[in-house]
Swiss-Prot record:
This is Phycocyanobilin lyase subunit beta. Belongs to the CpcE/RpcE/PecE family. It comes from Mastigocladus laminosus. The lineage of its organism: Bacteria, Bacillati, Cyanobacteriota, Cyanophyceae, Nostocales. Required for the chromophorylation of the CpcA gene product. Signal peptide: none annotated.
Length: 107
């Protein structure tokens, strides 16, 4: 979404609705849905007013979610990780999600 193209009152309403929706979706039983929500929340976390609830949700996810893809996605954004580890990841999370959804796995 390009929030900057909205008038300030509309922008705040749209950002709040996006945040509420993604926080709800981040609790979905399907890990693919949760992963997509984490990617969306990471994008929204660039907005200072939305950072606190997003950080709180990420802490909950790291403490409770057992799916490695979800926790790895969130850990990639952590400032405590080694810079070399994060720069080795060249694929964007949304692109990885598309690969997971559309590329059949060979077993």
């Amino acid at each position: 979404l390009q929030f900057c193209k909205l008038d300030p009152p509309q922008r705040q309403t749209a950002q709040t609705k996006a945040l509420e929706t993604l926080l709800l979706v981040s609790q979905d039983p399907n890990w693919l849905i949760r992963y997509a929500a984490v990617v969306g929340l990471e994008a929204l976390a660039k907005i200072p007013q939305l950072q606190q609830p997003i950080q709180t949700r990420f802490a909950q996810i790291l403490a409770t979610d057992t799916e490695q893809a979800i926790c790895s996605s969130r850990a990639t954004g952590s400032k405590t990780r080694n810079r070399r580890q994060t720069t080795n990841r060249k694929l964007k999370p949304a692109f990885v999600l598309l690969l997971i959804l559309f590329v059949p796995l060979s077993r």
